[in-house]
Amino acid sequence: MLVEYGFDYSSNFFDDDSPYLHEVDGKPTRIIELPFRWVLDDAPFFQYSIVLPGRTMQAPSALLEAWKGEFDVLYAEDRMMMIGMHPEIIGQPSRIRALEGLIEHALRHKNVWIGRCDEMVDDMRPGLERARSEAHR
């Protein structure tokens, strides 16, 4: 369906640490996957249950510490950091401060670009298509 409706990217899979081009039925597509991991999603930190035994709510500082740690490793490896956020979760006052803290931390580093998914795929598409072409030679 993503091909049929002309999607440029997807961020639905947890299967890699780097972006890649999708194939459908063994055929190449233009759809870029921007994979992410649960540690880079806001939901696991703040979704909770009032029924025991259940998950308890985390402090926003736990999210900030985890995301800064992930950023530091990914930055050292010259990799992309894909974050999953939900307005009803991250948009709470104390939680948005944690996101601001991550952005401030990231921007203290050189050559960091924070962009929308469509901007990222436009930037990385030529390199991914070139790599796929060279791999099939």
Language-model features, listed with the residues they occupy:
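Active-site-adjacent pocket scaffolds in enzyme catalytic domains
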Residues: 1-77, 133
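C-terminal domain-boundary segment and adjacent tail
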Residues: 9, 57, 61-137
